[in-house]
Amino acid sequence: MYNVIFVLGGPGAGKGTQCDRLAEKFDKFVHISAGDCLREEQNRPGSKYGNLIKEYIKDGKIVPMEITISLLETKMKECHDKGIDKFLIDGFPREMDQCEGFEKSVCPAKFALYFRCGQETMLKRLIHRGKTSGRSDDNIESIKKRFVTYTKASMPVVEYLKSQNRLITIDAEQDPDAVFEDTVKALQPYL
């Protein structure tokens, strides 16, 4: 029913930037950001999860998977109703139970793009982004917590998908244009 590509990488690795560019170049793909879904729900008037999501994001913690999967699936259904079935899901799964839960209850991902980037580069990008993003989690304290969470919880997902030969690794240390060029080349066999 759905064709899903997970898009993984640490905070500030460039996942959102690259997904936006890919969705623009290949109009058959829709970019769904797990973080954006959570922030939208957090700010939606009357949301029963808003305050909970806000606390998790502020503390750099991973929001319970049932909430995130439900929000992602709702977005996917909305797109599917418009005839779109190819998705770049950015920033998800963040831990193994999310990966297993999504693949069991929604659909298996075809593969994952992993934007590999060092913490020093990601930190510089996030500090720069924090000046204009208005995101509550683009501050040094939250960023450091997000790095710890990412390393402990998300790297096992990367290793798991790699062990299943469902991982394409992209060097995200480069400038965004070079990263995009490498990503498009890596995706060619799947388009």
Curated annotation (Swiss-Prot):
Monomer. Signal peptide: none annotated. InterPro entries: Adenylat/UMP-CMP_kin (IPR000850), Adenylat_kinase_CS (IPR033690), P-loop_NTPase (IPR027417), UMP_CMP_kinase (IPR006266). Binds 1 Mg(2+) ion per monomer. It comes from the Eukaryota. It is found in: Cytoplasm; Nucleus. It comes from Schizosaccharomyces pombe (strain 972 / ATCC 24843) (Fission yeast). It catalyses: UMP + ATP = UDP + ADP. The lineage of its organism: Eukaryota, Fungi, Dikarya, Ascomycota, Taphrinomycotina. Residues 128-138 are annotated as: LID. SUPFAM superfamilies: P-loop containing nucleoside triphosphate hydrolases (SSF52540). This is Uridylate kinase. Keywords: ATP-binding, Cytoplasm, Kinase, Nucleotide-binding, Nucleus, Pyrimidine biosynthesis, Transferase. GO terms for biological process: 'de novo' pyrimidine nucleobase biosynthetic process; CDP biosynthetic process; UDP biosynthetic process. GO terms for cellular component: cytoplasm; cytosol; nucleus. Its EC number is 2.7.4.14. GO terms for molecular function: (d)CMP kinase activity; ATP binding; UMP kinase activity. Pfam families: ADK (PF00406). Catalyzes the phosphorylation of pyrimidine nucleoside monophosphates at the expense of ATP. Plays an important role in de novo pyrimidine nucleotide biosynthesis. Has preference for UMP and dUMP as phosphate acceptors, but can also use CMP, dCMP and AMP. HAMAP family: Adenylate_kinase_Adk (MF_00235), Adenylate_kinase_UMP_CMP_kin (MF_03172). A ribonucleoside 5'-phosphate binds at residues 39, 61-63, 91-94, 98, 135, 146. Its cofactor is Mg(2+). Belongs to the adenylate kinase family. UMP-CMP kinase subfamily. Consists of three domains, a large central CORE domain and two small peripheral domains, NMPbind and LID, which undergo movements during catalysis. The LID domain closes over the site of phosphoryl transfer upon ATP binding. Assembling and dissambling the active center during each catalytic cycle provides an effective means to prevent ATP hydrolysis. Residues 33-63 are annotated as: NMP. ATP binds at residues 12-17, 129, 174. It is an enzyme of class 2 (transferase).
